[in-house]
Amino acid sequence: MNNVTEFILLGLTHNPELQKFLFVMFLITYLITLAGNLLISVIIFISPALGSPMYLFLSYLSIIDIFYSSSIAPKMIFDLISENNTISFNGCMTQLFTEHFFAAAETILLSVMAYDCYVAICKPLHYATIMTQSMCGFLMVVAGILGFVHGGIQTLFIAQLPFCGPNVIDHFMCDLVPLLELACTDTHTLGPLIAANSGSLCFLIFSILDASYVIILCSLRSHSSEGHLKALSSCASHIFTVILFFVPCSYLYLRPLTSFPTDKAVTVFCTLFTPMLNPLIYTVKNKAVKNVIKKLWKQIMTTDDK
């Protein structure tokens, strides 16, 4: 039986001055996230020079980051200046689904990108025959489907729990642990199963990524010094992105089902700052992307002068 039609979100802080500061900072960060990831996606789609699988996956990652951040950030930002910090039951379930859908899709996509890096370094002569356009499309579809399944399982598990009274969530969003704490039933058995769906996915993919890079680093011994540095440079951005994504993910889901004061800060970092940093990580040392951006900028300036 479910008597709860809406949840009250306590948010990040009750300090009015801090709320105003966070509102401005988070709004700017979110707009940079949208602009940066959209720019990367558009540049890759319109530039023939960035037609390799690596850039195709990067554009897909940017699109996922836009939706992932947008599933949480707008509501969180608006609530900082709103006096009515509530969310309907259906809205809560929708937020839970979209968050886990896009997070899982990104998790799987990062493993696909690691596989692409492995093939490029360890099997360079067979790269063109393995990483075909159809294979890349297939891998991206698989990431989307598995993300959808993961998000659906999490949402169905939570939605069927009875919520009969308490409806105050000590968070700025709907997530597994806060909702399990409000359920009017014993969740000692079901709770770990729900958490394991996220925790096991996080642990499995992170283990696959670790194994991939161990193999890559071992294979680099047979490369020349120049080839060694070039290969490391091509993978460094991906490794940094993996660390930014999986360290917070592991903290949130590879642990007992208990809320901690730091959960809110870690979630903000995951959903707002990591998606903002990803475009910067992949462009700072990427000459191909920077050259395309410079070329497009020159074309725009030339057009304006005319």
From Swiss-Prot:
TM annotation in the entry: 26-46, 48-68, 101-121, 138-158, 200-220, 234-254, 264-284
Segments on the Extracellular face: 1-25, 69-100, 159-199, 255-263
Keywords: Cell membrane, Disulfide bond, G-protein coupled receptor, Glycoprotein, Membrane, Olfaction, Receptor, Sensory transduction, Transducer, Transmembrane, Transmembrane helix
Main location: membrane
Membrane topology field: Multi-pass membrane protein
Cellular localization per UniProt: Cell membrane
Residues bearing glycans: N3, N84
Domain of life: Eukaryota
InterPro entries, sorted: GPCR_Rhodpsn, GPCR_Rhodpsn_7TM, Olfact_rcpt, Olfactory_Receptors
Signal peptide annotation: none
Stretches of the chain found on the membrane's Cytoplasmic side: 47, 122-137, 221-233, 285-306
UniProt GO molecular function: G protein-coupled receptor activity; olfactory receptor activity
Pfam families recorded: 7tm_4 (PF13853)
Function in brief: Odorant receptor.
Protein name in UniProt: Olfactory receptor 4C45
Species of origin: Homo sapiens
